[in-house]
């Protein structure tokens, strides 16, 4: 379909059938009409033969047995079955009906009347009311199509010599023919959609009612057919629900068709302006499109004269830098030409006396002489080709060669002839008859037609030979004994389905949609193309990173088609045909579900379950809906069964509960298999898709052994086709959700044991003891949390957890980069490196940056049992920082259900141990490590409190899986941290820990050789040593008094006083909060944010103050707003000051706040306070004076500025 001038590339993928080539007047549409007419005729012939057999059966009672046998074995033709019958419900009912025909009538021959009542009469009425009118409409459509093509050719043959008014009359004549053709085509579309639904209704209703009546009238039915009764009841319930929702669905479809018809007729109407029909070679088309498609007339006899040339209609396209065309085959197929790069093409306008609007696309080897319908259309083709050429040059696309069509971009590949035809009918036996002549094979061409739809389905999986015919499927299903409860063989050839959604239909009415010229809409090709035609995406090479420790994302992307059984190969080919290669993942099992939509609409569909998540495809009456639920968003699943259907519920994060009904499959089996996927997702060492298939097979075999009493010899392989009798396995009510599944060991012990066999760990039954050797000597933290070990592990060490990044930010780190996890080749343990950068100011005031690298090692990772993590950290604030690393070991062990134990120990790893000062450095490192631990504990208290009532999957989604990211994660500070780091000197450390210094000195001295130690002792107790010590002390005191004097000792005393005040800050945090919230300021402007306890009636006082108006109050409010803005800037400046800078600015800050308090006293002079507020203001003023010094230290100011946060205030500080 031709793209408009302003079509955006965003909508190119919305209608992906045949390069968005889905108009009513297109090759796919015409091929669909041809294919549809054959199917209608085949169905008419089959129904006629079927009714004749039924009448013979009724009339010939004595010959009842052979007639019943021939009727039950009369297989549906493949072209009819794949075209009309639903592959899940209608064909299942049909097969069950065939079995019951044979068994039930052999018991009671009196059921002939019921046969006439429930089957013959409805089908006969259906043929008269539905099939015959549709055949007549088909003939009418062919006549209108021939008339329309003839009119187009006649109109195109007009030359330039014609009068313009006559050309306008001819255009109107062409418009009438086109209008009649499009009207009939749209009527055909509407009738087709109702026709297919009517067939499903009549088949399901007739056969189900007849079968149920059969069970009621006889007690001597064959014992092997009793299980069919339950499923037929479910099918009838499904048909009833579907029939109830059909009026609402039909109303929606009719409204869409009416809107599309009006829009089509409006857009294809020819212009009335005569200038539109005038040839002007100087005119330029303004368009930025690089893609276009539509009908063009091609001169296929360029050697002849213009008046004798032969012109044919071709569907040309420009896409992805290539030019090509499609053409219809006489048998209803669509073939594609070889594609030519636009860089090799040259566009030129051809003036012609016999043809108007002609142009040429020429290369070195081929030349296309083409004719457009209008002058503007010709100019648009030229502009699109030039734009596509410029796009290839600018983007570096090498679209400059001729491509062979062996790798198609939008059609199926014809590698062989599937289902050979004999005398116009399919040879179901698979043998080639005498009169069979092989059809001509088209080498180098692409086939998309009724003879090739099987290739379209299986081309994505090279290991699938072909799809068995329906008869073979029927025999294989009846012959097998045991059944895989989900995803039985599709009874017809699997369709290749496109993404036609409600958004597609909506976009058809958009101004930027692909309506243009003679390409009006995209409807029937999408609808019918969803069965036998379709958009086959090119296979994309998915890059999988080479990691020694594969993550869940990598395992989910791995595809092992060759290792799958034949049934799953077919399901995977079908899945990639629907969802494309972008959602590439191995389909593990498929389930048929039915979902409820708006206006009581029931949407039947298939649920494809993969490691990535659940994909659901719904298709009814031409409307398609696609849903996707990632595996990470599924919190839990549950199911219960009833007589008419099974109910299956999924709790989806941020969405709620999604409800489904299962009529053919078992919700119990579906729940068990999804629980396997969910457990594998949260496992620390997830399994691959092949391992999960083995686990699912084990679960299925256990259920079969339980039902049969443990007959192991009767088990079949996973790929063997099962029978229908195992479809209804145990349907007991199940309340297992994911949280119960991983925590409750008492229920379903065999299920748990199977999960353990396949390395899907579950909750331990006993307390896990941590070996003392796993920790360092100094254990500084030991606490029990009311969450599971896995939940606590992800809260602390998850990829999105902020525990570690917050600890770095607390100590002034600006940039932190967490590298991906990898394997240590020496220890074979998982580890990751952490790079970060800190800033420091030298003595000249220049900012210097320092880079450090820490390491995190995962020592033990045992699912639900024990986790041990080691953190090697550089302390950049301590001297000799390159001589050691701080080691912090964290262990999380299982205590009991929903309880875990957290142990943290700290130590030092010396690279080079210095003399005499190792003890004091160890003490300072312990203090620093305890600060980190306090930050972690404050965060864990709040995080575990929130996670107590959350499911495990929600916790993993919030904090991230451990080691599941493949690229570095970088965290940057949101608030600039431009302060100078407080680096401790070795003298300060020794002065604060002098006793530990003496111990370290003594220990290191004892390690010295005895001769050196003897000389040191003699000098230590000599007279010269004491004189030297006395002289040094005198010089030190004199230098201190000379350099600092009394001011030094005053500052030191102030420092001690301020330190005491800061230690009491936590006890008076409430007072500091309302001081920061500026109660006095807000009170004066009438918007207080904090209510003081001394206020008796705050609402009345505030109301009386707000209602009082005076000039003095207005002046005061303006003045206070100005002061508040100044005060805010000072607070922001205080946030960036450190302790020493505060000492310098302390007097200025105190003076400023005192001026503010004097301003508050002036408020009383202006009589702005009601009497009832006097006590409140006095208390506020007193508290303000007492808390003045709280704005001194940087960490405290930062904390005051972030007090408005609800739960992360302490952590953000």
Curated annotation (Swiss-Prot):
Q: Which InterPro entries does this one have?
A: AH/BAR_dom_sf (IPR027267), BAR_dom (IPR004148), PH-like_dom_sf (IPR011993), PH_domain (IPR001849), Sip3/Lam1_BAR (IPR039463), Sip3_PH (IPR042067), VASt (IPR031968)
Provide the alphabetized UniProt keywords: Cytoplasm, Cytoskeleton, Membrane, Nucleus, Transmembrane, Transmembrane helix
Tell me the GO BP annotations in alphabetical order: endoplasmic reticulum-plasma membrane tethering
Q: Which CDD domains match?
A: BAR_SIP3_fungi (cd07609), PH_SIP3 (cd13280)
GO MF term set: lipid binding
Q: Where is the VASt domain?
A: 776-945
Domain PH per the UniProt entry, residue ranges? 289-390
TM segment ranges = 996-1016, 1025-1045
One short Pfam name that applies is: VASt
Q: How does it sit in the membrane?
A: Multi-pass membrane protein
**One annotated Gene Ontology cellular component of this protein:** nuclear membrane
- Places the protein is found: Cytoplasm; Nucleus membrane; Cytoplasm, Cytoskeleton, Microtubule organizing center, Spindle pole body
Q: Which PANTHER family does the UniProt record give?
A: CYCLIN Y, ISOFORM A (PTHR14248)
Provide the protein name.
Uncharacterized PH domain-containing protein C19A8.02
Organism for this UniProt entry: Schizosaccharomyces pombe (strain 972 / ATCC 24843) (Fission yeast)
Q: What is the lineage of its organism?
A: Eukaryota, Fungi, Dikarya, Ascomycota, Taphrinomycotina
């Amino acid at each position: 379909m031709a793209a408009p001038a302003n079509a955006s590339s965003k909508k190119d993928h919305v209608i992906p059938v045949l390069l968005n080539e889905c108009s009513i007047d297109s090759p796919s549409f015409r091929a669909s009409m041809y294919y549809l007419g054959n199917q209608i005729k085949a169905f008419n012939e089959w129904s006629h033969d079927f009714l004749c057999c039924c009448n013979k059966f009724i009339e010939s009672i004595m010959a009842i047995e052979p007639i019943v046998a021939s009727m039950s074995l009369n297989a549906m033709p493949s072209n009819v079955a794949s075209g009309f019958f639903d592959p899940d419900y209608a064909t299942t009912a049909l097969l069950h009906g065939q079995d019951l025909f044979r068994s039930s009538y052999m018991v009671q021959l009196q059921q002939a009347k019921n046969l006439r009542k429930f089957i013959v009469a409805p089908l006969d009425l259906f043929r008269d009311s539905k099939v015959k009118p549709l055949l007549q409409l088909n003939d009418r459509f062919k006549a209108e199509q021939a008339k329309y093509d003839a009119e187009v050719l006649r109109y195109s043959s007009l030359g330039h010599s014609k009068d313009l008014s006559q050309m306008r009359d001819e255009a109107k004549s062409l418009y009438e023919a086109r209008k009649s053709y499009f009207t009939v085509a749209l009527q055909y579309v509407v009738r087709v959609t109702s026709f297919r639904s009517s067939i499903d209704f009549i088949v399901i209703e007739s056969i189900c009612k007849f079968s149920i009546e059969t069970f009621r009238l006889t007690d001597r039915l064959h014992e092997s057919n009793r299980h069919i009764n339950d499923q037929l009841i479910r099918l009838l319930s499904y048909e009833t629900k579907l029939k109830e929702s059909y009026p609402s669905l039909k109303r929606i479809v009719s409204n869409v068709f009416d809107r599309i018809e009006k829009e089509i007729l409006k857009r294809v109407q020819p212009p009335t302006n005569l200038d539109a029909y005038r040839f002007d070679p100087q005119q330029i088309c303004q368009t930025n499109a690089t893609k276009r498609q539509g009908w063009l007339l091609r001169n296929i006899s360029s050697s002849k004269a213009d008046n004798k040339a032969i012109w044919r209609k071709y569907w040309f396209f420009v896409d992805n830098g290539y030019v090509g065309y499609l053409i219809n085959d006489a048998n209803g197929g669509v073939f594609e030409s070889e594609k030519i790069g636009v860089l090799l093409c040259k566009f030129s306008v051809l003036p012609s006396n016999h043809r108007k609007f002609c142009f040429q696309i020429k290369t070195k080897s081929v030349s296309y002489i083409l004719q457009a319908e209008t002058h503007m259309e010709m100019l648009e083709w030229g502009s699109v080709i030039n734009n596509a050429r410029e796009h290839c040059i600018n983007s570096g696309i090498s679209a400059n060669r001729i491509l062979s069509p062996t790798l198609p971009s939008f059609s199926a590949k014809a590698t062989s002839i599937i289902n050979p035809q004999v005398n116009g009918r399919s040879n179901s036996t698979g043998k080639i008859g005498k009169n069979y002549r092989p059809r001509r094979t088209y080498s180098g061409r692409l086939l998309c037609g009724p003879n090739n739809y099987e290739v379209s389905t299986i081309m994505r999986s090279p290991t699938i030979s072909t799809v068995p015919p329906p008869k073979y499927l029927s025999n294989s299903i009846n012959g097998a004994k045991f059944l895989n409860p989900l995803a039985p063989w599709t009874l017809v050839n699997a369709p290749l389905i496109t993404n036609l959604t409600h958004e597609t239909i909506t976009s058809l009415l958009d101004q930027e949609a692909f309506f243009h010229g003679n390409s009006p809409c995209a409807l029937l090709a999408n609808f019918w193309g969803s069965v036998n035609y379709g958009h086959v995406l090119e296979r994309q090479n998915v890059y999988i990173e080479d990691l020694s420790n594969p993550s869940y994302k990598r395992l989910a992307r791995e595809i092992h088609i060759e290792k799958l059984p034949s049934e799953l190969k077919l399901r995977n080919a079908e899945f990639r045909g629907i969802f494309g290669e972008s959602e590439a993942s191995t389909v593990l099992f498929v389930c048929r579900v039915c979902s409820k939509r708006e206006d009581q609409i029931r949407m039947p569909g298939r649920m494809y379950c993969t490691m990535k998540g659940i994909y659901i495809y719904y298709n009814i009456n031409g409307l398609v809906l696609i849903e996707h639920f990632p595996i990470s968003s599924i919190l839990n699943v549950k199911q219960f069964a009833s007589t008419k259907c099974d109910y299956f519920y999924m709790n989806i994060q941020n969405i709620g509960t999604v409800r489904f009904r299962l009529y053919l499959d078992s919700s119990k089996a579906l729940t068990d298999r999804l629980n396997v996927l969910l457990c594998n997702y949260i496992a620390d060492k997830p399994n691959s898709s092949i391992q999960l298939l083995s686990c699912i097979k084990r679960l299925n075999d256990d259920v079969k052994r339980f039902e049969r009493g443990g007959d192991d010899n009767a088990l079949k392989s996973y790929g063997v086709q099962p029978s229908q009798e195992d479809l209804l396995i145990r349907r007991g009510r199940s309340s297992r959700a994911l949280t119960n599944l991983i925590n409750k060991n008492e229920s379903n012990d065999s299920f748990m044991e199977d999960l353990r066999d396949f390395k899907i760990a579950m909750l331990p039954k006993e307390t896990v003891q941590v070996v003392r050797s796993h920790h360092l000597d100094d254990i500084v933290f030991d606490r029990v949390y009311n969450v599971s070990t896995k939940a606590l592990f992800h809260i602390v060490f998850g990829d999105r957890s902020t525990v570690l990044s917050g600890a770095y930010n607390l100590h002034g780190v600006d940039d932190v980069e967490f590298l991906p996890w990898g394997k240590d080749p020496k220890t074979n343990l998982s580890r990751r490196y952490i790079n970060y950068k800190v800033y420091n100011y030298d003595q000249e005031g220049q900012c210097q940056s320092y880079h450090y690298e820490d390491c995190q090692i995962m020592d033990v990772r045992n699912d639900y049992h024990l986790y041990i993590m080691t953190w090697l950290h550089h302390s950049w604030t301590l001297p000799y920082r390159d001589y050691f690393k701080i080691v912090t070991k964290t262990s999380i062990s299982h205590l009991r259900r929903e309880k875990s134990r957290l142990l943290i120990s700290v130590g030092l790893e010396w690279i080079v141990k210095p003399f005499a000062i190792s003890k004091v450095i160890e003490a300072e490192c312990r203090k620093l490590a305890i600060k980190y631990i306090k930050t972690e504990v404050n965060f864990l208290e709040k995080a575990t409190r929130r996670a107590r009532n959350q499911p495990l999957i929600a916790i993993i989604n919030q904090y991230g899986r451990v080691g599941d990211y493949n690229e570095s994660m970088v965290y940057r500070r949101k608030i600039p941290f431009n302060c100078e780091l407080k680096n401790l000197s070795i003298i300060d450390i020794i002065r604060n820990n002098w006793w530990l210094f003496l111990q370290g000195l003594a220990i290191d001295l004892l390690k010295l050789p005895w001769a050196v130690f003897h000389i040191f002792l003699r000098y230590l107790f000599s007279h010269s040593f004491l004189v030297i010590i006395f002289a040094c002390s005198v010089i030190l005191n004199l230098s201190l008094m000379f350099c600092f004097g009394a001011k030094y000792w005053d500052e030191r005393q102030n420092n001690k006083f301020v330190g005491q005040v800061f230690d009491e800050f936590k006890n008076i945090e409430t007072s500091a909060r309302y001081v920061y919230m500026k109660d006095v300021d807000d009170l004066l402007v009438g918007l207080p944010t904090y209510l003081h306890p001394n206020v008796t009636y705050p609402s009345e006082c505030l109301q009386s103050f707000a209602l009082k108006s005076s000039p003095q109050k207005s002046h005061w409010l303006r003045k206070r707003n100005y002061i508040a803005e100044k005060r805010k800037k000072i607070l922001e400046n205080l946030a960036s000051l450190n302790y020493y800078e505060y000492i310098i600015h302390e007097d200025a800050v105190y003076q400023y706040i005192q001026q503010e308090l004097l301003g508050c006293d002036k408020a009383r002079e202006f009589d702005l306070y009601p009497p009832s507020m006097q006590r409140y203001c006095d208390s506020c003023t007193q508290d303000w004076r007492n808390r003045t010094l709280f704005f001194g230290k940087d960490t405290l100011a930062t904390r005051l500025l972030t007090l408005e946060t609800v739960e992360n205030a302490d952590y953000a500080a």
